[in-house]
From Swiss-Prot:
Subunit structure of this chain's protein: Interacts with PRD1; this interaction facilitates a binding to PRD3.
Biological process per Gene Ontology, one example term: meiotic DNA double-strand break formation
This protein's UniProt keywords: Meiosis
Function statement: Required for meiotic double-strand break (DSB) formation, the initial event for meiotic recombination.
Tissue and organ expression note: Specifically expressed in buds.
Protein's organism: Arabidopsis thaliana (Mouse-ear cress)
Observed phenotype of the null mutant: Reduced fertility upon self-pollination, producing polyads with an abnormal number of microspores during pollen formation. Meiocytes are defective in homologous chromosome synapsis and segregation. Homologous recombination is severely affected during meiotic prophase I.
Keyword Acetylation annotated: no
UniProt KW Protease keyword: no
High-level lineage: Eukaryota, Viridiplantae, Streptophyta, Embryophyta, Tracheophyta
The protein's name: Protein DOUBLE-STRAND BREAK FORMATION
Length: 233
């Protein structure tokens, strides 16, 4: 969902801390500095819209390599820190607002090259939809959405999360098969389930690999922390 969402923050938005000022000054070009600072201001003003993402993208494209690497790193830290505050402010907001903010952060993290945080946002959006789907059928998550997310997680080096998504995809496929047990589509469901099982098994094999287990544990912990945070929704 890509709605333009702006809600009132419970904090004081106009105060800029020294870390943000330092980030702004790291940009050597005044136009780039203005764009970067403008993006920070818009996030603090809770303007989670296409314009904010466009400003972020333009500021990153215009940077030289040295500025890009340093400013991108600082923006990642800023967005991670700000997300914790913002998610605490979402209690009481509509489901559309919550999902839209998660989508905004997922896309912003993707632009910043932080795929771990990007996938965390998408994972929580899928979980939130699934959690609320019994009372709001339109929020239901299809097996294809879970499968697509599992593939993306594998491709970006997070097989532990891919395994969890695969399990959710299999549960969704099982429900589909119970709804239409004799339909012509049932064979397609069985084929899809077999592909997902292979994906799940591959993810499990990689997750248990000793060489990368620390990375996967850290990733899992980050998702778990984010998940506990969003249960207050």
């Amino acid at each position: 969902m890509r709605h333009n969402i702006k809600f009132k923050s419970k904090g004081t938005l106009k105060i800029r801390n020294t870390a943000q000022i330092s980030l702004w000054k790291k940009c050597s070009d005044s136009m780039i500095a203005d764009q970067t600072y403008l993006f920070i201001n818009r996030v603090q003003d809770r303007r989670f819209d296409e314009e904010s993402l466009r400003i972020l993208e333009l500021s990153l494209v215009a940077m030289n390599v040295k500025s890009f690497l340093e400013v991108r790193s600082r923006l990642r830290d800023f967005m991670r820190s700000e997300s914790v505050v913002i998610f605490g402010e979402l209690t009481g907001e509509s489901m559309v607002a919550k999902l839209s903010v998660l989508e905004f952060f997922a896309r912003a993290f993707a632009l910043l090259g932080d795929m771990e945080s990007c996938l965390a946002m998408r994972y929580e959006a899928l979980n939130l939809r699934q959690l609320k789907s019994p009372s709001c059928l339109w929020l239901g998550v299809s097996h294809s959405e879970w499968t697509k997310f599992a593939v993306q997680s594998m491709e970006n080096g997070f097989p532990s999360i891919a395994g969890k998504a695969s399990e959710n995809a299999l549960l969704s496929l099982k429900k589909d098969s119970l709804i239409e047990p004799k339909s012509e589509d049932n064979s397609d469901i069985l084929d899809a389930a077999e592909k997902v099982r292979r994906l799940r098994d591959s993810a499990a094999s990689l997750t248990s690999s000793h060489s990368g287990i620390f990375i996967y544990i850290v990733s899992s912990l980050k998702f778990a922390v984010c998940n506990r945070l969003l249960t207050t929704f």
